[in-house]
Amino acid sequence: MADELTVDIVTPDERSFQGPANGVRAPGIEGSFEVREDHAPMIAAFGIGPLIVKTQAAHEYADMHNDRIIFATSGGFLEVIDNKVTVLAETVEPASEIDVERAESAEERAKRRLEEGVQEEERETHEAARDRARNRLRVAMGKVGTRQS
C-alpha cells in the first residue's frame, strides 16, 4: 500500500496545486465522492462545489487546522491512477484568495437577472453564475465541512 496520494490540480490557465495528500473530496455530478490511497482507477466528472484536499503538511492555502485546502470549483474532471489524482478543472480558487465582495456582487447580479425574467436559453447561464457565486461565498466563509454541505 502507498502512504499517500499525489495530487495535481490544473486549470486551462495554471497549475493551482501539486503535492501529497491523504484524500480528495470532489462535488460529483451525482453527489460528492472521496478518493483515498489505493483507490481503483477512475475518471469522474464533477460540478460546481467545494473541492477539498486533505493535506499531510502545512500549506499556504491550508485552513486554520492546516489539514485541508478548500477550493471553490466550477466543474471539470478528476482522474485517479496509481495513487495519483489529477484534477482538470474549469476554475479553482483557494478559499483564502476569494474576494467576498466580488462574489456577493456576482450573486446579486445573477439573482437580479433571474428575477427580471430572461429567455429560457439564458436562464441556465444565470443560474450557473448564481450557483458559482454561492459556492465561492460558502467556501470563503468556511461553510464547508469534511463532507459536502
UniProtKB/Swiss-Prot annotation:
Q: How does it sit in the membrane?
A: Peripheral membrane protein
Provide the disulphide bond pattern: none
Q: Where in the cell is it found?
A: Cell inner membrane
Q: Where is the composition biased (Basic and acidic residues)?
A: 99-116, 123-134
Protein keywords? ATP synthesis, Cell inner membrane, Cell membrane, CF(1), Hydrogen ion transport, Ion transport, Membrane, Transport
Gene Ontology cellular-component terms for this entry are: plasma membrane; proton-transporting ATP synthase complex
* Predominant subcellular localization, coarse grouping: membrane
Function recorded in the entry: Produces ATP from ADP in the presence of a proton gradient across the membrane.
What NCBIfam families does UniProt report for this protein, alphabetically?
ATP_synt_epsi (TIGR01216)
Question: What family does the Swiss-Prot or TrEMBL record give for this protein?
Answer: Belongs to the ATPase epsilon chain family.
- What's the protein called, per UniProt? ATP synthase epsilon chain
Lineage, opening ranks: Bacteria, Pseudomonadati, Rhodothermota, Rhodothermia, Rhodothermales
